[in-house]
UniProtKB/Swiss-Prot annotation:
Keywords: Histidine metabolism, Hydrolase, Manganese, Metal-binding. Coiled coil: none annotated. Its cofactor is Mn(2+). This is Formimidoylglutamase.
Length: 329
C-alpha cells in the first residue's frame, strides 16, 4: 500500500457526454484510478496519469515564498477547462495526491517515488503536479527505480536556477534536488547527464557556476542565450544532449518565466524564457521518443493573479501531451 496517498473525490471534475468529444473539455474526460487497488493491471495503449505532490516544505526550508502546496489543485482547475484534443484512444487518469502535512520532506519524496514507479508499472505515463521543486527529487527516484539498474536517466530542467546547492548543513530543500541526484548517480558510478534551460545569472552564485564547470556532464543555456538563439537552435542543443541517451525526465519550474507570464511562483522573476518558445522545446523533447515522465512545479496560487500561472502550467501539459500521445512504446 502506498503511503501518504489520497484519492480525489469522484465529483472533483465535471463529467460530460463521452460521445461528444468535439465539445469535450479535459475535466469531462479525465478518469479516476486508485493506485492501492490490488487488482489493477497494466493498461494498453497511450495513457497518462496525473498525480499531485502537495508539499512546499522544501520551499519553506529554502526561505522561499510558500504556497506551492496549493499548486496541484489550481493546475487541475485550469486544466479541466481546456478543450480535449487527444481523441478517443488516449486516456488521462487522475490518481490523486501525495500529501502529508505532518510528514517530513524526505518521507513525502519517498512516497512520491513509489507512486511514480507504480504508475510506470501500470504503463501510465506520469505527469506530476507540484508542489515545490523538491517534487523533482521524488519524481526522479521513482522514474529511475522503474528502469534497469544499468540504465541511466538524463534530466532536462527548464529553470532559472541550477538547484545544485549543497545540503550537508541545511538538509534537502527545493534548491538541492539536482545535487542529490548528482551525488546519488556518482555513488552508483554513473554519470549525471543534466541540461538546464533558462538559467538567470543574477539568480545563481559563482559557487554554482564553478561546480557546473568542474562537472563532466552538466550543460546549460541561460535565458539570454535562449533569447538570442531562438527555438530551432535550442532544439539542436537538446538533440545533441539526447543523442546518446535512452531515457529523459523533464521538469518544468514555472519560475523560469517572467512575472508577466508567471506571477504566482515561489521565486518571482523579472526576466524569463518566452512561454511560446518553451512549448516548442517541450514538444521537441516529447517527439524524441525518449521522454518517460515530466512534472510542472512551483505554481504558488496565493501569489497568482487571475490564475495566470496555473493556466500557464496547464497549457504546458496540454501542448506537451499532444505530441507525447503520438509516441508509442
Amino acid at each position: 500500500m502506498l503511503e501518504d496517498y489520497y484519492q480525489l473525490d469522484n465529483s472533483y471534475y465535471q463529467r460530460g457526454v463521452e460521445d461528444n468529444l468535439y465539445a469535450a473539455k479535459w475535466g469531462m474526460v479525465i478518469e479516476f484510478l486508485n493506485l492501492n487497488d490490488p487488482n489493477l493491471k497494466p493498461v494498453e495503449g497511450v495513457n497518462f496519469a496525473l498525480i499531485g505532490f502537495k508539499s512546499d516544505k522544501g520551499v519553506y526550508i529554502n526561505h522561499g515564498r510558500v504556497g506551492a502546496v496549493e499548486g496541484p489543485q489550481s493546475i487541475r482547475t485550469q486544466l479541466a477547462k481546456l478543450p480535449w484534443h487527444l481523441g478517443r484512444n488516449v486516456h488521462v487518469f487522475d490518481v490523486g495526491d501525495i500529501d502529508g502535512p505532518n510528514r517530513s520532506l524526505e518521507q513525502l519524496q519517498s512516497s512520491l517515488a513509489k507512486a511514480v514507479k507504480r504508475l510506470r508499472e501500470l504503463n501510465l505515463r506520469p505527469i506530476v503536479l507540484g508542489g515545490g521543486h523538491e517534487t523533482a527529487y521524488g519524481n526522479y527516484l521513482g522514474l529511475k527505480s522503474s528502469l534497469k539498474p544499468e540504465q541511466e536517466l538524463a534530466v532536462i530542467n527548464m529553470d532559472a536556477h541550477f538547484d545544485l546547492r549543497p545540503y550537508d548543513q541545511t538538509g534537502p530543500n527545493s534548491g538541492t534536488g539536482f545535487r542529490q541526484m548528482f551525488d546519488e548517480t556518482l555513488a552508483q558510478k554513473q554519470v549525471f547527464n543534466y541540461l538546464i534551460l533558462g538559467i538567470q545569472e543574477h539568480n545563481n552564485n559563482l559557487f554554482l557556476f564553478d561546480f557546473v564547470a568542474k562537472s563532466k556532464a552538466i550543460q546549460f543555456l541561460t535565458g539570454l542565450d535562449i533569447y538570442q538563439m531562438g527555438h530551432k537552435e535550442v532544439c539542436k542543443v537538446v538533440d545533441a544532449f539526447l543523442a546518446d541517451k535512452e531515457q529523459v525526465y523533464l521538469t518544468i519550474d514555472i519560475d523560469c518565466f517572467a512575472a508577466g507570464a508567471a506571477p504566482g511562483v515561489s521565486a518571482i522573476q523579472s526576466l524569463g524564457v518566452d512561454p511560446n518558445l518553451a512549448v516548442l522545446v517541450f514538444q521537441h523533447i516529447a517527439a524524441s521518443g525518449k521522454l518517460i515522465g515530466f512534472d510542472v512545479v512551483e505554481v504558488s496560487p496565493p501569489h497568482d493573479i487571475d490564475n495566470h500561472t496555473a493556466n500557464l502550467a496547464a497549457s504546458f501539459i496540454f501542448y506537451l501531451t499532444q505530441v507525447w500521445a503520438q509516441i508509442h512504446d
